[in-house]
Amino acid sequence: MALPNQQTVDYPSFKLVIVGDGGTGKTTFVKRHLTGEFEKKYEPTIGVEVHPLDFFTNCGKIRFYCWDTAGQEKFGGLRDGYYIHGQCAIIMFDVTARLTYKNVPTWHRDLCRVCENIPIVLCGNKVDVKNRQVKAKQVTFHRKKNLQYYEISAKSNYNFEKPFLYLARKLAGDANLHFVESPALAPPEVQIDLAAQQLHEQELLQAAAHALPDDDDEAFE
């Protein structure tokens, strides 16, 4: 699908919209992919930057046209033009800022109002930061809405490929699809405590085994 400012390529390409509160790290995340950063285009009518992110799979190359809001969400909601023709999405929140997680349902609602039945990944960013405010076990929204959830650290490249691989598998209808080489990523700006992160991953697994709370906000009181 050729969208504004997107060159047509002869391999599968998809419009990926990335939403979430301002300051959650959406732009930092997209900019890690160096060729996408180099080839980005600005779409002035909607006020977004479109980054073409290529990935190499066992079934050939695929491209995600990542639409980045350029900070517009700080001034209110996004226009429908941002969402229209979206084929997949990432909702991002900051694990060091509780409000950004509390606002996830609003972003999800806005997204689903325009884009029905598209694959969506929820990402908790900044897991490299020590003073985490949203604990792994408190993240339950994805279970209620049947979304995939990943903990990421954009600045350290931790789990960078996972959201894209999940979306690629869903869009291709192939659970065995895999990446055969890594994209060129910017060097890590921070190092992540892998032992601490493995502990969070364990908490996620344990949380998944428990019944869902009635109210998402209970854990924050």
Swiss-Prot record:
GTP binds at residues 21-28, 71, 125-128, 153-155. It holds the Pfam family Ras. Residues 71-87 are annotated as: Switch-II. Its main location: nucleus. It comes from the Eukaryota. GO terms for biological process: protein import into nucleus; ribosomal subunit export from nucleus. InterPro entries: P-loop_NTPase, Ran_GTPase, Small_GTP-bd, Small_GTPase. Keywords: GTP-binding, Nucleotide-binding, Nucleus, Protein transport, Transport. CDD domains: Ran. Residues 40-48 are annotated as: Switch-I. It is found in: Nucleus. Residues 10-174 form the Small GTPase Ran-type domain. Belongs to the small GTPase superfamily. Ran family. Found in a nuclear export complex with RanGTP, exportin and pre-miRNA. This is GTP-binding nuclear protein Ran-B1. It comes from Nicotiana tabacum.
